[in-house]
Amino acid sequence: MKLSQVPLKEIECAGPVMRASTPYILEYAEVASLAEDLFETYRSKINHAATKLGPRQRESNAESYALLGPDRELGHFHVVYDVDETRLAIELSDDEADKFYRLMRDQRIITPDLGLIRRVMSGNMAETVAAMLWQIGAIKVTLGDLRPLYKVDEGRNYSPIYIDVKGLASYPEVNDFVLSSAALLVRNLDFDVVCGIESGSIAIAAVMAQKLAKPMFYARRARRYPEASPFEGIKSHELFRKRVLLVDDTLVHGWTKTRVIREIREWGARVEACFVIFDRQQQGSTDLEQAGVKLDSLTNRDAALSPKIPREISFLTDEEYEEVVRYFADPGAWHAAHGYTFHEPSPLD
């Protein structure tokens, strides 16, 4: 059994101990192979000085393994077989326990809980939506030590944070709350038709259009052949002089959106408003403003990093929070500090 296969019901890290539990009663053979894989993960990703896994020590309904170095014990892996779950604990140094926590937190069983969010925080709508995105794992963070940094700006630059809301539909309660809130936000805008962008925002645009009782079409990312229409779901004469609300999942620089805006206008329609679920606040709104389009967003990076969102919702560590803040404050300096060349974002590069 691989460590990455274990679904976790709970996970926490306090000092030198990372604790987790799975709702499954693991078999002895599964735990034995799990311990082997845990040790290999520890040696390859966290402490190259580790030499071997100690023998299993069993007592009553628990067992443990020592993680051994050349001349001493480096830590321990404990397993407790409970009535309806298997509890796991890893004892290491504070720093190493934190790394194991960051490795394993994405394996938690995601159970969206809007009630919990409302109980533990008192934020505005943007902060509440951001908390829900954290809760379902739509916002991801890496320091680059255990998992690679994310590539952005068409693969030319790096980022410690990635926002992916394409999985909203996997969580119906969250999806309904977020898109109902989105429809409420744009209901007073003047538009006749909703336009999504292939492929990330097609589902978002379709649900919003349904809630707003408006027709919907979508723009292609690229034409498959020169004569192909840039749009699907609408004909040229149907778009003539229509007011279009452009909808997308996230906004970084706005290059794709300004291209779509230009193509819509070439078909004789008007575009004066754009809506996104998440705005990374990296000058994308300025790009849209220069194109004569006003941006509305449901949430953004400021809301996602709000101190009102507790760590039991975001699962973010202090080190990760500080890393993301440094990145957004000055991406160029952040790249230099990590030994990377920063390429000034430009759609013409």
What is each residue range found by the language model?
Residues 1-247, 251-349:
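PRPP-associated nucleotide enzymes
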